[in-house]
Design a protein with these regions (language model features):
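Short, glycine-/small- and polar/acidic-enriched structural segments
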Residues: 23-167, 181-187, 203-204, 210
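Solvent-exposed, polar/charged alpha-helical surfaces in well-ordered, non-transmembrane soluble domains
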Residues: 49-50, 72, 76, 90, ...
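Pocket-lining segment of extracytoplasmic ligand-binding domains
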Residues: 119, 170-268
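Secondary-structure end/capping motifs
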Residues: 225-317
């Protein structure tokens, strides 16, 4: 009897374990980003909501202070997919074969040239007086691109000023301590300097007529070998934006927590400004931006302008064809899969 009871118990346990064993294992995917940035918020939201597992992914995150070290880390395969600025995305293609697979946001207004409050009136009234001055910025970044577009707006060139390459935290410290007058920053660092030191935005990338897109990226080798995982990654990212844009009060709450993790504290008003000044893209809008049915796409043009700027700075030697690295193949996979498409567009 004892044997029979034990056998029955074992059979029951095996039956109970059967369905659990049948569940497919989650696919690990290494996701890279820069902390406490607007376009990286979807990664945090998706994790808090448990959406990665819903599509069969298990993310492993790595963060970087800026795009250049992030791109360099791809050489050791320390990440598979992620988000970055458009300038490092182009650099990543040239140096490491990285693919641009989508857009994080339009951050044209989120990259700017700022001026210290004590000299704000001087440079606002006479921007040309920046000639001969020193501008602190992070080289080969979207902030660099925005600053140079602003200089062009005012009839100046990079040769007319002294550029000093520094990290964003160092720039904030220098301006706050009155050791610098002019600086190139991206949001939310812009808001930090405005709120903590009273700095003023002299000119944004948008005001300098520069389109500054943020990029979703993937290592070329990984994307080629794991196209389904890349499509799932995109679907998760898009769903997070769908939810964020439909639930602003909760979005601000989550942004507050996410920014705090990266040591950033800005006012709710500045957080809302992130949403109102930096458009994001639905699945349909992503596909429209990448559409080449009539020739070059909008994204092709934006990234060609970025590459032209980079050749001018000496970061790259020639301008690569956008079609060599900007690809809609993975967004199209999301669109073609009914489940992923519905998931990406879900706002709850």
């Amino acid at each position: 009897m004892k044997f029979a009871f034990a056998l029955a118990a074992l059979s029951t346990a095996l039956l109970a374990a059967g369905p659990a064993r049948a569940q497919p294992a989650l696919a690990e995917i290494k996701v890279s980003y820069q902390p406490a940035l607007y376009w990286a918020l979807p990664f945090y939201v998706a994790t808090e909501k448990g959406w990665w597992a819903e599509v069969g992914l298990k993310p492993e995150f790595s963060t970087f202070p800026a795009g250049v070290p992030q791109i360099a880390a791809s050489a050791s395969k320390s990440w598979d997919v992620g988000g970055t600025g458009s300038v490092p995305a182009v650099l990543g293609h040239v140096r490491f074969g990285i693919k641009t697979i989508g857009l994080t946001n339009d951050e044209s207004a989120g990259n700017a040239l700022l001026v210290r409050k004590d000299v704000a009136d001087k440079f606002t009234k006479d921007p040309a007086s920046m000639k001969g001055q020193t501008i602190l910025l992070t080289a080969n970044s979207t902030g660099d691109y925005a600053v140079q577009s602003c200089l062009k707006k005012y009839g100046l060139t990079k040769a007319d000023v002294t550029i000093k390459n520094m990290g964003q935290a160092e720039i904030i410290s220098a301006v706050s301590s009155n050791n610098a007058d002019l600086a190139g920053l991206w949001a939310p660092n812009i808001y930090t300097l405005e709120e903590k030191a009273g700095a003023k935005v002299l000119c944004s990338g948008k005001e300098g007529s520069a389109m500054v897109p943020g990029a979703l990226i993937a290592r070329g080798e990984y994307a080629e070998s794991n196209p389904e995982n890349v499509a799932k990654f995109l679907a998760v990212y898009l769903r997070a934006w769908s939810w964020l844009n439909a639930n602003k009060p909760q979005a601000i709450e989550m942004m507050t927590k996410f920014y705090a993790q990266g040591g950033v504290s800005i006012s709710p008003a500045s957080m809302m400004k992130e949403f109102t000044t930096r458009p994001t893209y639905t699945l349909a809008q992503q596909l429209t931006a990448m559409d080449r049915t009539r020739g070059t796409s909008n994204m092709d043009g934006w990234f060609a302008d970025i590459a032209t700027f980079m050749r001018g700075t000496g970061a790259i030697q020639s301008i690569p064809a956008s079609a060599d690295y900007v690809t809609d193949a993975y967004m199209k996979r999301v669109q073609a899969d009914p489940k992923l498409r519905e998931f990406a567009n879900r706002s709850n």
